Amino acid sequence: MENFKNNELESSPIINKNNSSHSINNEDNNYYSHNLEHNDNNNNDNNNTITNSHINNHDHKHNHEHEHKHKHNHDHNHDHDHNHEEEYGHGNELEHNNDQEHNVGNKNLLTNNNNQSKKKKHGHSHGGGEDGSSSGGGGGRHGHGHSHGGGSGSDHNHGSSDEDDEESKPLNQLRNLDSKKKARYSLILALTLTTIFMVGEIVGGYFANSLAIMTDAAHLLTDIGAMFLSLFAMWISQHPPTSSMSFGFHRAEILGALVSVLMIWALTGVLVYEAIQRILYPPDAVDGKIMFIIASCGLFINIIDAIILHWGSGGHGHSHGGGHGHSHGIGGGTQKKKSKKNRLLNNQGQDIEDLGGENGKNKKGVRNINVHSAYIHVLGDCFQSIGVMVASCIIWVHPHWKIADPITTLIFSVIVLGTTIKLLRESLGVLMEGVPPEIDVSEVKGDLSEIEGVTEVHDLHIWSITLGRPALSVHLTILPTIDPEEILSIANKILLEDYEINHTTIQIEKPLVKDKCKDHSCPPPKPKKKKIKNDNLSSPPNQ
């Protein structure tokens, strides 16, 4: 029970067994005092300091149960009817000896009548909690920050212990390394290893008289050229947009990858021609032992390069944060991601969340196409090295089977060409402004059509500026009574959260405007009406 008094100061500490009395000092000349009944199952003397951050207008009974296994065990029964927006701080010193005295110093804004129910926000800090309704489970040090607002939701941030944070810092720095830097470092390291080994292969292939080894060395030469080209493309793609290149130079990466693929195809054609010549005109003796040693070393180097480039391409990058975001509805359960059909315009005055913050959805890793093209080169070299090892083993055991050398060259040349098909398709898809393969146009159109107030979706175009940078333009026809700004906000939210498209151009149209708009073309000009001459009116009748 709480008694509110205006324009007078009361401080009434009361000490009762199994009862606690609160004295409240309010700076805004609104005062109240209330008694709380506690059932404490604690025979120990504990001194606790509880700091809460509340924003409320409140009049409440506390009737809830907490069982904390850190410094004390007690039962509190609290009944909360939360609906408040006020800020107050509790400095409570509790003596648990079945007789409790509570001194509370509050700075609040209270504008309520007696016996009025309140809704409030809580800020809790639990150290090492294992049990309880809001503890995260597990021992050790665990911090919780809770914000409960009037049944509309709550946010939880669960942080790990300080020791865990210190231990995970180097790993997090490695994971969070800028993708561009990671790609550049991987290319430089792979380029250095490849150059050193290429020189060794050229010398070894010359003395072994092996076309397969010389073929592998030639592949390494194209790898080096492709890596230099990739580094140049990455450098120029970082240049800002200009007046003549409004999208910037992002597609330089795509051009570099395309040229790299064409280099592989050209070199493979030359090697196939040489292999056919060796089949028709067999060479002199081939040293299978030297071939095997060099091919084994080549395979080892290529595997190292492949691991480095796969790491640098960022194809499986993950971002692991230390916190969790939850939203709790009126029923108290966790509210999952809204379904597409529920993202409707139910409230004209609703707020649209900031989608660019740190708590937004983590994007899945997008691989760097230049590093990936170099990775394809190295992967082809791995196949080539395996082929050389097979041929060298055959020639080592049976020296007269020299034909195994060009045959393996032909077989693995075809395999190398096969590894470039996907990269070639991706490069051409971006240059031809095709729809990104991970996005379904019909699904996007259906999601936009489900927005309440949208009557039609047309002129939908989706393309990629470069890999991982999709763009979209669309026309949305809406009802005349709907606010266009709300439709625009909801459409952008759907596109960003579900499809990770943040470069959008959305045109909102009313029905009259839509009638003049056609897909993919402007309305044709209206034909001019022909004037019909009337001879009877132009010349007087003959008499």
Swiss-Prot record:
Gene3D superfamilies: Cation efflux protein transmembrane domain
GO molecular function per UniProt: metal ion binding; zinc ion transmembrane transporter activity
Extracellular compartment segments: 208-216, 273-289, 397-402
Disordered: annotated span: 1-175, 319-342, 516-543
Biased composition regions of type Low complexity, renumbered to the chain: 11-26, 41-55, 105-116
InterPro entries: Cation_efflux, Cation_efflux_CTD_sf, Cation_efflux_TMD_sf, CDF/SLC30A
A Pfam family matched in the record: Cation_efflux
CC terms in the record's Gene Ontology section: contractile vacuole; pathogen-containing vacuole; plasma membrane
Compartments where found: Membrane
Membrane topology: Multi-pass membrane protein
Listed Basic and acidic residues bias regions: 56-66, 76-104
Ranges of biased composition (kind: Gly residues): 130-140
Keywords: Ion transport, Membrane, Metal-binding, Transmembrane, Transmembrane helix, Transport, Zinc, Zinc transport
Topology feature Cytoplasmic, residues: 1-186, 238-251, 311-375, 424-543
Residues annotated as transmembrane: 187-207, 217-237, 252-272, 290-310, 376-396, 403-423
Family listed: Belongs to the cation diffusion facilitator (CDF) transporter (TC 2.A.4) family. SLC30A subfamily.
NCBIfam families: CDF
PANTHER family for this protein: CATION EFFLUX PROTEIN/ ZINC TRANSPORTER (PTHR11562), RE54080P-RELATED (PTHR11562:SF17)
Purpose of the protein: May be involved in zinc transport from the cytoplasm to either intracellular organelles or extracellular spaces.
Name assigned to this protein: Probable zinc transporter protein DDB_G0283629
Organism of derivation: Dictyostelium discoideum
